[in-house]
Design a protein with these regions (language model features):
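C-terminal cap of metal-dependent C-N hydrolases
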Residues: 284, 300-329
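Charged helix-capping and loop-helix junction motifs
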Residues: 26, 58-66, 233-239
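Metal-associated gating/positioning segment near the N- to mid-region
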Residues: 1-62
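Short, surface-exposed secondary-structure edge patches
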Residues: 295-299
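A generic structural signal for well-ordered alpha-helical segments
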Residues: 35, 170-171, 192, 212
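Hydrophobic residues within beta-strands of alpha/beta enzymes
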Residues: 43-45, 109, 200, 252
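Metal-coordinating catalytic core of metallo-dependent amide/deamination hydrolases
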Residues: 49-53, 58, 62-183, 255
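Active-site-adjacent C-terminal substructures of enzyme catalytic domains
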Residues: 82, 177-293, 313
Length: 329
């Protein structure tokens, strides 16, 4: 299976709030083992570039270094790629990108806008609920968060407006594929399409999903959302999308639960989608969307990446994982 967006690596760097794991290579290898045991053979590690939380900013260099060194030294079983999630509302984003944008393992870059009141966080109460409970964002409770939200709103809109064209130019000149993140309205999708972007990652509304498909963009939806029958942040239900029109969903992403990818394939089976079509959402379609033509299906002269899966109490259990024809798990 091919995973285009997972931030699972971050969990191994911050296993508990404010507890940073000191050995970055060990954290990256632990993540790789979890990824492979979940049946993922090609993984795009989603790295948040530009952020407001000090703890996530503090591990950025170590996270990027861990993947880079792990790749250079051949330490991983899965094929890892860097997927930069660019927070356009961060006024310091361009300075951060200047330091990290030349990494040879960057394959995908998403343009994200987490301005309070916009896109995923158009419901500010949900943003407060998501961030306000954890010490990663504020150590002074909800009142401090409200004050910070007001300040962020004032600066974030200006930063997003400045950053979007410049960041797009950076990736276009480097020939890095771009995705639009958390599209909410037709206007968001239209803007992305005009910018040459053909991947809509985690569109948050039915309106955005339909517009993306109308413009022949590839839609990436969250597998955890599909398995749970709802979004963790009140976005459109992927289960409802599938029931409404299976063709609205091109690609599944495990996002924050690696095992959700294989579970989604078999949930589709239970809904009457045949195995070939359901498997495409985690194999051929993601590979094709990012130009990985050597994988995604089993053919002569392509990588022999495949799984053996059994069922235990109606749950898919990954028994064996093969990468390039060699068993790795």
């Amino acid at each position: 299976m091919i995973e285009l967006h997972t931030d699972n690596l971050e969990k191994h760097f911050i296993p508990r709030p404010n507890a940073i794991w000191p050995n970055k290579i060990a954290a990256a290898i632990a993540n790789d083992n979890e990824i492979v045991s979940s049946g993922i053979t090609t993984v795009f590690d989603a790295i948040l570039v530009g952020n407001y939380t000090k703890i996530r900013t503090s591990i950025l260099d170590d996270i990027i270094t861990s993947i880079t060194r792990g790749k250079d030294l051949g330490l991983f079983k899965a094929d890892h790629h860097l997927h930069y999630i660019c927070e356009l509302s961060d006024p310091e984003l361009l300075e951060t990108l200047e330091k990290y944008s030349d990494n040879k393992y960057i394959t995908l870059a998403s343009l994200m806008d987490h301005t309070p009141g916009q896109r995923q966080w158009r419901n500010k109460e949900k943003m407060l609920e998501f961030y306000g409970k954890g010490s990663n964002f504020t150590s002074h409770g909800a009142y401090d968060f409200d004050e910070r939200m007001l300040r962020l709103e004032e600066t974030a809109k200006e930063a997003e407006k400045k950053n979007r064209p410049k960041v797009s130019t950076i990736w276009r000149e480097k020939k890095i594929i771009m995705a639009s993140h958390d599209d909410t309205t037709e206007e968001h999708v239209n803007e992305a399409s005009k910018n040459g972007i053909y991947i809509s990652e985690f569109p948050t509304t039915l309106e955005a999903v339909k517009q993306a498909k109308k413009l022949k963009m590839k839609t990436v939806l969250g597998a955890p959302n599909f398995i749970r029958n709802k979004s963790h942040s009140d976005n459109v239900s992927v289960n409802d999308l599938v029931d409404n029109n299976f063709d609205l969903v091109d690609i599944f992403s495990s996002d924050y639960v690696p095992l959700s990818l294989i579970q989604s394939v078999f949930k589709l089976l239970h809904k009457g989608v045949n195995l070939s079509e359901s498997t495409k959402l985690v194999s051929y379609n993601p590979a094709n969307s990012v130009g990985l033509d050597d994988r995604g299906n089993i053919e002569i002269n392509k990588r022999s990446d495949f799984l053996r899966v059994a069922f235990v109490e109606n749950t898919p259990l990954i028994k064996e994982v093969y990468i390039k024809g060699k068993r790795v798990n």
